[in-house]
Amino acid sequence: MPVKIVLLGPPGAGKGTQAKSISNRYSIPHISTGDIFRKNISENTPLGIEAKSYMDNGQLVPDEVTINMVKDRLQQDDCKNGYLLDGFPRTVHQAEALDNFLTEREESIDTALLIEVPKEFILERMTGRRVCPSCGASYHIKFNPPTNDGKCDLCGSDVIQRKDDTEETVKERLDVYENQTQPLIDFYKNKKQLSVVDGTQAINEVFESICKILGSDK
């Protein structure tokens, strides 16, 4: 039975890791809006050309362009047995457009899967990340610190905190997520399509919780 999933969750919730595991377990494509944009732009599709013209002018790509890209992607053969949408929909307008498109095809989303993680937990998780600028090795000052304080275990370079991981930046991203996504969460809750998973668990436990929701008979 096909399984169609919308994946929701704040930055730092581990969506990418879980998306990969879900895709493998259920043999469905992991569809991210970033990948769709890059593919359309690199292949110079009409939608890609239109999107690029907005981006080149420093403008936001209109919802309709994004929606049409997603519609095209969902009609490809590898989506016949379901798919995992990551990064779409971002707004209630996009969710309604997706609903209308699926209704026309006599289909619907099976679940909107929310990986829920408290803000304090994400702040600790993201602001503690460190990376080696020389070899790319990743660390965490609490959960996976380098053996020698501040030095990469592999090459000895000083590890750094990326700009994206500073407390100010993380808080800004979380505020944007909250303001943008709460109406979307309410939308799926009202449609009784929302499933919530505790994202503070260990990675394998989060995945086990997801499988219980989706059914693990694949």
Curated annotation (Swiss-Prot):
Source lineage: Bacteria, Bacillati, Bacillota, Clostridia, Eubacteriales
Binding site for AMP: 33, 38, 59-61, 87-90, 94, 162, 173
Organism listed in the record: Clostridium perfringens (strain 13 / Type A)
Region annotated LID, chain positions: 128-165
Region (NMP): 32-61
CDD domains to which the protein is assigned, alphabetical: ADK
Binding of ATP, residues: 12-17, 129, 138-139, 201
Protein name: Adenylate kinase
Annotated TM spans: none
Function: Catalyzes the reversible transfer of the terminal phosphate group between ATP and AMP. Plays an important role in cellular energy homeostasis and in adenine nucleotide metabolism.
Residues that bind Zn(2+): 132, 135, 152, 155
EC number: 2.7.4.3
Pathway of action: Purine metabolism; AMP biosynthesis via salvage pathway; AMP from ADP: step 1/1
